[in-house]
Design a protein with these regions (language model features):
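C-terminal, non-catalytic "cap/extension" segments appended to globular domains
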Residues: 2-29, 33, 193-194, 369, ...
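Short, hydrophobic/amphipathic alpha-helical patches that form generic packing surfaces
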Residues: 66-77, 140, 242, 342-349, ...
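Short pre-active-site segment immediately N-terminal to the catalytic Zn-binding motif
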Residues: 456-478
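Amphipathic alpha-helical coiled-coil segments
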Residues: 38, 42-45, 61, 68, ...
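C-terminal non-catalytic alpha-helical accessory regions
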Residues: 35-126, 559-571, 575-592, 599, ...
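Active-site-proximal, well-structured secondary-structure segments within enzyme catalytic domains
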Residues: 130, 134, 163-169, 173, ...
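His/Asp/Glu-rich acidic catalytic environments and adjacent acidic regulatory segments
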Residues: 2-33, 80, 87-297, 396-399, ...
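Membrane-entry segments of alpha-helical transmembrane domains in multi-pass membrane proteins
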Residues: 19-31, 53-58, 259-263, 302-309, ...
């Protein structure tokens, strides 16, 4: 095992992470070394001082925390994108140590007292606003971390944090393992009628890789979803739907082999731990705890917001479903729509109504044109240039870029676009390094990870074919890049509130959802399309059809997101984990009250709902819709500017950069939004953009 700190690549902070050298054996020595140093810093800072200042207290604590956080961030990232037994073991060995340290700091009464003393000192008023906000956030976090609890309760609180981290990790691992384990082989090509050629080619390649005949499908989204959307064989759609809807549950395909992959018990454990944590802190429920650092005032406000949105969307959703049911019966011979019919029937209905298909559109979005078009838009909006750069990466398909303005480096990012075994599903942005101005006056620029799970390029007859993106995948890429811009274009020099740091969780989706809107602009799309076979730009007539179909089934889609948000809130607000009611009953009650499309009784989507059980969205999934109000209203400012000409659009872009992206978490999100928009947010733009305006 590598124990020499001087030779451990995970401890090299001189530049970018050395992904070409870091292995699982480096993790424990590096984390132990950094924890030892961090505990020593904390011990030194506990000692009484004549005066508490930023420089003699906050800065050294941030220095130690940042190095530990950066190293652990690399480990966590690798665990998400190149899962191996060795790396997983190293991660699980060290996660409890990290949790223990975080809790020890959060409950340290001496540190807490010093933050409060600094807040009350005469020197506080002389600090710049970003530093004041960091101090206020720290005091809040100490209180929420149990610093004010009596000793016995502190001990229990710490145990809760450690167990919660372990169970949450186990939840994620179960989803990943169940996803990777499932393989469906189809040997008769006739069973794949309706499936696009590129989906069949990918399935053929997977079968060959696994040494199997025919075509093989997995539960990775680019593999299974084309079956639900395009396969004519209803039984095949049902098979794949059941497998995906029951993964990591007692009803899953793999349950007979690995009962420990069932997340049902983990969900209950997590809810119990969160409820106990809330009670220890003096709150009625975990939803109240979750909302302390957010824009929303209380759970009642969130529930009222969601129920109001459901009320507005329901008439449109009912109309959507009635039309789909009639079409399925009359045109497809499906008398009773089932869950595995809805994507298929919806695709057929959209083709019939708007005379185009998602597969037709996909041919115009080869990866290189989409990425180039995205970069072109960013350059135009924010006066920056994006260029390829070099850095060690964790996989051969990962690319690295730099963002500059007037020759000055602003930030860098890794782009990891393709789905693969050992990589967690979904799409996300995370920070590898935050912007910070050091005590020596040297600026540390931000670095981001941008991760998606799109279909990798296919090799046909020895020739590599470009990866083609669906329009939904284009939107996903723009979404994640919006997060990346928030992180990389910040001008705040204090680590705790630069970029995405310190931004309220229900506002952090504003920049990401804002970027999605550009995926519907002709001037943007016309520069990022080229037909895979002919090279032709997206025809204006096809674009017009896409635009006409933009709000296709928006009522159903809105209700689906509201359903997820409400069940998340109710599980953390008025559900009693030790009571007679089960998690499934709560979900069923929410669906009965608000849903138009009720999933089958065997559906266990919650068993892979990583956002709230293995991510940061517990009692916070509503943030997507909450922030969509902000992002739609922000984009409406650009729509208004377009009517006034290019100069107005340019000025609006500069104002958005100045008031939203640049300031990061250095001030409240509502203050930033109001500075940009000139008023508080309105839901009107969201309803209009969704085709649900009154």
């Amino acid at each position: 095992m590598t124990t020499d700190a001087s030779n451990n690549p995970l401890l090299d902070f001189s530049g970018l992470p050395r992904f070409d050298a870091i292995t699982a054996e480096h993790v424990t020595p590096a984390i132990d070394h950094l924890l030892e140093k961090s505990y020593a810093v904390v011990a030194a800072l506990e000692a009484p001082t004549a005066e508490v200042t930023w420089d003699n207290f906050v800065a050294p604590l941030e220095d130690a925390s940042e190095l530990l956080g950066r190293a652990w961030g690399v480990v966590s990232h690798l665990n998400n994108v190149v899962d191996t037994p060795e790396l997983r073991a190293a991660y699980n060995e060290n996660q409890p140590k990290m949790t223990e340290f975080g809790t020890a700091v959060a409950q340290n009464e001496a540190l807490f007292a010093k933050y409060k003393a600094l807040r009350a000192s005469a020197g506080f008023d002389a600090l710049e606003p970003a530093r004041k906000r960091i101090i206020d956030n720290a005091i809040r976090d100490f209180r929420m971390g149990g610093a004010e609890l009596p000793a016995e309760q502190k001990e229990r609180f710490a145990a809760i944090q450690e167990e919660h981290a372990a169970v949450s990790t186990r939840f994620s691992e179960n989803v990943l393992d169940a996803t990777n384990d499932y393989k469906l082989t189809v040997e008769d090509e006739a069973d794949l009628a309706g499936l696009p050629d590129d989906a069949k080619q990918a399935a053929k390649a997977l079968a060959e890789k696994e040494g199997k005949p025919g075509w093989m499908f997995s539960l990775h989204f680019p593999s299974y979803y084309p079956i639900l959307q395009f396969a004519d064989k209803r039984a095949l759609r049902e098979t794949v739907y059941r497998a995906n809807a029951t993964k990591a549950s007692d009803l899953g395909e793999v349950f007979s082999k690995r009962e420990d992959w069932d997340n049902t018990g983990n969900i209950v454990t997590l809810l119990k731990l969160r409820d106990e944590e809330a009670k220890l802190l003096g709150y009625k429920n975990f939803a109240e705890v979750s909302l302390v650092p957010k824009m929303a005032k209380d759970p009642e406000q969130v529930i009222a917001f969601l129920e109001d949105l459901a009320r507005r969307a329901r008439p449109y959703a009912e109309q959507d479903y009635a039309e789909l049911s009639t079409f399925a019966k009359d045109e497809l011979g499906i008398d009773q729509l089932q869950a595995w019919d809805i994507p298929y029937a919806s695709e057929k209905l959209q083709e019939a109504r708007y005379a185009f298909s998602a597969q037709e559109v996909k041919q115009y979005f080869p990866e290189h044109k989409v990425v180039d078009g995205l970069f072109r838009l960013i350059s135009s909006l924010f006066s920056v240039t994006i260029a390829p750069d070099t850095a060690p990466a964790w996989h051969k398909d990962v690319r690295f870029f730099r963002i500059e303005r007037d020759g000055k480096l602003l930030g860098q990012f890794y782009l990891d676009l393709y789905a693969r075994a050992g990589k967690s599903g979904g799409a996300w942005m995370d920070d590898a390094r935050g912007r910070r101005l050091g005590a020596n006056g040297q600026l540390q620029t931000p670095v981001a990870y941008l991760t998606c799970n799109f279909t990798e390029p296919a090799v046909i007859d020895g020739k590599v074919q470009p990866s083609l993106f669906t329009h939904d995948e284009v939107i996903t890429l723009f979404h994640e890049f919006g997060h990346g811009l928030h992180h990389m274009l910040t001008q705040v020099n204090e680590l705790g509130v630069s970029g995405i740091s310190g931004v309220e969780w229900d506002a952090v989706e504003l920049p990401s959802q804002f970027m999605e809107n550009f995926c519907w602009e002709w001037e943007v799309l016309s520069h990022m399309t080229a037909h895979a076979a002919t090279g032709a730009t997206l025809p204006r007539a096809l674009y017009d059809k896409m635009l006409a179909a933009k709000n296709f089934q928006s009522g159903m889609q809105t209700l689906r997101q509201v359903e997820f948000s409400l069940l998340d809130m109710h599980l953390h607000y008025d559900f009693q984990p030790d009571g007679a009611k089960t998690v499934q009953q709560v979900i069923d009650e929410v669906r009965a009250k608000f849903s138009i499309v009720i999933p089958p009784a065997f559906n266990r989507f919650q068993n892979s709902f990583g956002h709230i059980f293995a991510g940061g969205y517990a009692a916070g999934y509503y943030s997507y819709k909450w922030a969509e109000v902000l992002s739609a209203d922000a984009y409406a400012a650009f729509e208004e500017a377009q009517a006034l000409g290019e100069d107005a659009v340019s000025e609006t872009g500069k104002r958005y950069l100045r008031e939203i992206l640049s300031v990061g978490g250095s001030r409240p999100a509502l203050e930033s939004f109001t500075a940009f928009r000139g008023r508080e947010p309105s839901i009107d733009a969201l309803l209009r953009h969704s085709g649900m305006a009154a």
